């Protein structure tokens, strides 16, 4: 329900011993089975328990919690919250080859990029796409499991003294700079 209301990632952690009860929650995008316990303390639950038939990753006993977290981050290409990260901020109406080239340059800087999508849908005719539609365009154009966040219509960025990051403009060359989002929207009929 939270995912439907907010259109964001939701993580659910619970013990659900049967396939039937798991199916009642719907199909998750990612299902991780943490299979550490051979037998629980409740005999009735042990008797009815069914191993998941379809999981994306099974974690067995023997790993530390930190090792489990690193395995999940690596397996699903999730962001490492402590690693240096490059921020791309834009409308991406729609995501196109120029944005893709910029993301590739951003990845070269730190190896991890957050794509911050400004919430501008409906502000003008140049902003027809919702956040969800923008993320779909990003995914369709070669970005596997993009780390995107929805942000307000940010129009100004200010900072005080040197605070440990830099703001830089990347020159992608005349051919990339010539790409027009307006023309892309016309081509796509949006």
Model-derived features: where do they sit?
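Glycine-rich phosphate-binding loop used to anchor ATP phosphates in small-molecule kinases
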Residues: 1-39
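Phosphate-binding beta-loop-alpha motif at adenosine-nucleotide cofactor sites
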Residues: 12, 56-67, 146-147, 170-172
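Short glycine-/acidic-enriched loop or helix-start segments at secondary-structure transitions
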Residues: 21-24, 42-44, 98, 157-160
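Small-molecule kinase domains that catalyze NTP-dependent phosphoryl transfer to phosphate-bearing small molecules
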Residues: 24, 34-79
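Short, structured coil segments at secondary-structure junctions
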Residues: 27-28, 53-54, 144, 163
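Nucleotidyltransferase catalytic core that binds NTPs
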Residues: 77-190
């Amino acid at each position: 329900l939270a995912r439907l209301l907010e259109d964001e990632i939701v993580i659910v952690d619970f013990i659900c011993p049967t396939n039937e009860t798991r199916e009642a929650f719907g199909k998750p995008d990612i299902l991780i089975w943490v299979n550490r316990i051979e037998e629980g303390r409740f005999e009735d639950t042990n008797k009815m328990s069914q191993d998941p038939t379809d999981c994306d990753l099974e974690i067995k006993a023997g790993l530390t919690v930190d090792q489990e977290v690193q395995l999940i981050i690596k397996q699903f290409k999730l962001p490492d919250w402590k690693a240096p990260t490059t921020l791309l901020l834009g409308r991406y109406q729609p995501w196109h080859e120029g944005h893709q080239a910029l993301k590739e340059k951003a990845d070269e800087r730190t190896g991890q990029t957050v794509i911050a999508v400004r919430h501008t849908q409906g502000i003008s005719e140049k902003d027809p796409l919702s956040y969800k539609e923008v993320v779909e365009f990003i995914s369709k154009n070669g970005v596997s499991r993009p780390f995107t966040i929805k942000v307000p219509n940010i129009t100004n960025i200010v900072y005080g003294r040197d605070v440990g990051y830099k703001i830089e403009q990347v020159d992608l060359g005349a051919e990339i700079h010539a790409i027009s989002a307006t023309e892309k929207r016309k081509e796509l009929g949006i």
